[in-house]
Regions:
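N-terminal "arm"/small-domain region of PLP-dependent enzymes with the aminotransferase-like
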Residues: 1-48, 140
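Glycine/small-residue-rich loop that forms an oxyanion/phosphate-binding "nest" at active or ligand-binding sites
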Residues: 77-86, 90, 178, 182
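Conserved PLP-anchoring active-site segment centered on the Schiff-base-forming lysine
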Residues: 88-109, 134
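Active-site phosphate-binding strand-loop segment of PLP-dependent enzymes
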Residues: 116, 122-182
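Short acidic capping loops at alpha-helix termini that bridge into adjacent secondary structure
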Residues: 68-72, 93, 173, 180
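Short, structured coil segments at secondary-structure junctions
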Residues: 68, 111-112
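Short loop-beta-helix segment that forms the pyridoxal 5′-phosphate
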Residues: 50, 62-84
Length: 182
């Protein structure tokens, strides 16, 4: 089907009305020289399909972070990992923030998971505040998914709040998925 008007993803940088585009992970300073050189150096590898298990990357992350390879999951973008989380762990009822990245609800529902929402308030500039903790404590589900910073609000959850959320999720044996891509 053809559309008379485009339905683009991301900002319209070509209109010159946008200085910085936060709708996609685009470096506003351009591609670093080291990345350009890495692309040039690997052109001959383009005939090979990438390693689906990302063995070299997993090894490098494991060594750099000092964690076992079995604790590392790599994928082709955040959406693949979000869907993998939902399929692999199979939560029955998950809590997401509202507003938030729409892919969480899509992935959860695709895995036959019931989705509940905790609404962030305009009056508090969409910050996650203390009223969330008692709500989470009494939530009758088995998973919590959110991004930090929040998409689309850009609000960052404090370290203290993250630690309290983690404590509640551990005590309640809830899956916790924190997306920090941006």
């Amino acid at each position: 089907m053809l559309y008379s008007t485009p339905n683009p993803h991301g900002g319209d940088l070509y209109s010159r009305k946008i200085c910085l585009d936060f709708s996609a992970n685009i470096n506003p300073y351009g591609t670093p020289e080291a990345v350009k050189q890495a692309v040039i150096d690997s052109v001959s590898d383009l005939r090979h399909y990438p390693d689906p298990y990302c063995r070299e990357l997993v090894t490098a992350i494991s060594e750099f972070e000092g964690v076992g390879k079995e604790k590392i999951l790599c994928g082709n973008g955040a959406a693949e990992l979000i869907f993998s989380f939902c399929r692999s762990l199979g939560p029955k009822k998950a809590l997401i923030l509202d507003p938030c990245f729409s892919e969480y609800e899509t992935a959860l529902r695709a895995s036959q998971c019931e989705v509940a929402h905790f609404s962030l308030k305009k009056e508090t500039d969409f910050q996650l505040k203390g009223d969330f903790l008692p709500f989470l404590e009494h939530f009758d589900g088995d998973a919590l998914m959110f991004c930090n910073p929040n998409n689309p609000t850009g609000q960052i959850i404090s370290r203290e709040m993250l630690e309290e959320i983690l404590t509640i999720c551990e005590r309640r044996k809830m899956f916790l998925f924190i997306d920090e891509c941006f």
